[in-house]
From Swiss-Prot:
Pathway: Carbohydrate degradation; glycolysis; pyruvate from D-glyceraldehyde 3-phosphate: step 2/5. One of its GO terms (cellular component) is cytosol. It catalyses: (2R)-3-phosphoglycerate + ATP = (2R)-3-phospho-glyceroyl phosphate + ADP. The gene is pgk. It is an enzyme of class 2 (transferase). This is Phosphoglycerate kinase. Keywords: ATP-binding, Cytoplasm, Glycolysis, Kinase, Nucleotide-binding, Transferase.
Amino acid sequence: MSFLTLKDVDLKNKKVLVRVDFNVPVKDGKVTSKVRIEAAIPTIQYILDQGGAVILMSHLGRPTEGEYDSQFSLEPVAEVLSQIIKKPVRFAKDWLNGVDAKAGEIVMCDNVRFNKGEKKSDDELSKKIASLGDVFVMDAFATAHRAQASTYGVAKYVPVACAGLLLANEIKALEKALKAPKKPMAAIVGGSKVSTKLSVLHNLLDKVEILIVGGGIANTFIKAEGFNIGNSLYEEDLVGEAKDILAKAKELGVNIPVPVDVRVAKELSENAVAVVKNVADVADDEMILDIGPKSERNIAELLKSANTILWNGPVGVFEFDNFAEGTKALSLAIAESDAFSVAGGGDTIAAIEKFDIKDKVSYISTAGGAFLEFLEGKKLPAVEILKEKATI
């Protein structure tokens, strides 16, 4: 990797500013998911072990920038972190004018979005943040696609900037899957809209041997193949684009197994009864809500041949058990595979948890937007600035 990581930097007696991703769900002042907090522990612990002081920064939710709002305060997060790491975590509500932190201490700064100029990476704000520490550690991959004061601007002005353990692992796993994959490679791109994943589909066409589409995206492809999809969710204006992708895939020898059978219902509800039909038999008043058993077997068979698997998005409305079979079959096929597998995106992580295959996926990305932008082949500003700093 062409940037410094935490392990390349002397941290003894240094004030270490760490941008973490503690954008966690908080309900009635209580943190309801600790996954992102737990993911940051190795970086925090490493700095403490090396004799540094830890000053943590994160955003939480979408408050009006520049205004304090108690419902978006990171104070409950500081309490949970303290319980997990079994050490005191000092909470700093007002921190821009200086943070007093000694070696071995942990300070949690309040929401970076309470600072005016955070989102546009205001220079004065970035300099102020940079003045708080000797070393800046970027460990929030989920916000790496945003050039903001606490992710990008601070790195420009601090003496030393490096990647945290989580960020470094995240990029290493994604580069292993995308830049030097062990072939054959399969990618699963699911979700409701082609429009949000269009660049991803195009970028992956040049890299994979198998491209599996699911969810509303698959409906658009089924329509592109000339079948009636009834009342199903799809994007009419992108049917032509789907045809182009299918034609390009054929040219490149990429296999896109468009579903041959589906599970349909008359309405989208938890109690709707799933009826299995061939794609040619979908009625006008029916909605495609999952793939069918033949399509499940096709996908499972294809994934057996893969040495690298990239997964982003479900293949059906898996939140409802009657339409979860396709995503369950996909999950189990990935779990049983010996391939190097990388999965990312909120719905994908929810599916991994639902079908209990967390330990069977090689790497699970905690990021949403940044994960997608990486798949699109875009550069991530907060990572690029670390590369620039490493060459200075």
